[in-house]
């Protein structure tokens, strides 16, 4: 199925690209999410008239993500979890815990935006985590996991 992309999609194309995708991907994801429209002659002509407006909207979103990345980059957050004597956590620190902590600090971050290269954190220590704010913008934060020992 041919679709016209309304925004840049990683590994697929950029704004205004006409690409062939599987029908299910178009019907179930791209079109409902507002990321693409079916590529008919009428839609293509309509898109060309709105291209400048859509490009400006995408640039504004990118600028906002860049501004938020500047605030986030290098940020240190501390999370306390119960841990044993050897520093091993009872449970783990997940992307949901990190997103919750960032929301407490007035950042609009969802758990799906957080990438943890080392997987879930199961030991006390400092870890670098990536926050993906946009396809092209990400920030690196440091998560310091503190152990609360129980007696």
Curated annotation (Swiss-Prot):
Alphabetically ordered keywords of this record: Ribonucleoprotein, Ribosomal protein, RNA-binding, rRNA-binding
A cellular component term, taken from the record's GO annotations: ribosome
MF (Gene Ontology): rRNA binding; structural constituent of ribosome
Coiled-coil residue spans: none
GO biological process: translation
InterPro entries: Ribosomal_bL9, Ribosomal_bL9/RNase_H1_N, Ribosomal_bL9_bac/chp, Ribosomal_bL9_C, Ribosomal_bL9_C_sf, Ribosomal_bL9_N, Ribosomal_bL9_N_sf
Keyword RNA-binding listed: yes
Domain of life, source organism: Bacteria
Function comment: Binds to the 23S rRNA.
Family: Belongs to the bacterial ribosomal protein bL9 family.
Protein name (record): Large ribosomal subunit protein bL9
High-level lineage: Bacteria, Pseudomonadati, Pseudomonadota, Betaproteobacteria, Nitrosomonadales
């Amino acid at each position: 199925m041919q679709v016209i992309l309304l925004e840049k999609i990683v590994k697929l194309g950029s704004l205004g690209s006409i690409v062939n995708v599987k029908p299910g991907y178009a019907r179930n994801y791209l079109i409902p999410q507002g990321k693409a429209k079916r590529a008919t002659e009428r839609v293509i002509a309509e898109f060309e008239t709105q291209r400048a407006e859509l490009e400006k909207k995408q640039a504004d979103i990118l600028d906002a993500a860049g501004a938020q990345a500047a605030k986030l980059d290098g940020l240190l957050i501390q999370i306390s979890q119960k841990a044993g004597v050897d520093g091993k956590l009872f449970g783990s620190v997940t992307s949901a815990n990190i997103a919750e902590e960032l929301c407490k600090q007035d950042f609009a971050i969802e758990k799906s935006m957080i990438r943890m290269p080392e997987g879930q954190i199961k030991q006390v220590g400092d870890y670098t985590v990536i926050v993906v704010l946009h396809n092209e913008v990400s920030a690196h934060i440091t998560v310091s996991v503190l152990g609360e020992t129980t007696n």
